């Protein structure tokens, strides 16, 4: 099933501005971690570091068996995933 997970964080806490944060992101999106989590990462999009606003937003498109699998995938990430919603390609539902 296809899902979109949404994440936000304050710009002042952006992991992209800290070496430890960059390491965390590299580990999270490593092929090994993705494989072990049992997901397919279709796409990952963040407004940072280009967004100079107060809040950065991220959207992750993930193929997984259920919402819990996605939450487990993000477990090591020290940020909160706000929402995980199932999605489908609109043209295929018509």
Task: Identify the residue ranges that each predicted region occupies.
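Conserved, structured core segments of small domains
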Residues: 1-94
């Amino acid at each position: 099933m296809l899902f979109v997970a949404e994440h936000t964080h304050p710009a002042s806490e952006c992991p992209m501005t800290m070496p430890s944060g960059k390491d965390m992101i590299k580990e999270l999106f490593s092929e090994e971690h993705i494989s072990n989590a049992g997901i397919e990462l279709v796409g990952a999009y963040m407004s940072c570091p280009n967004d100079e606003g107060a809040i950065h937003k991220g959207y992750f498109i993930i193929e997984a068996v259920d919402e819990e699998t996605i939450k487990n995938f993000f477990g090591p990430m020290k940020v909160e995933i706000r929402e995980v919603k199932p999605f489908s390609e609109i043209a295929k539902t018509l």
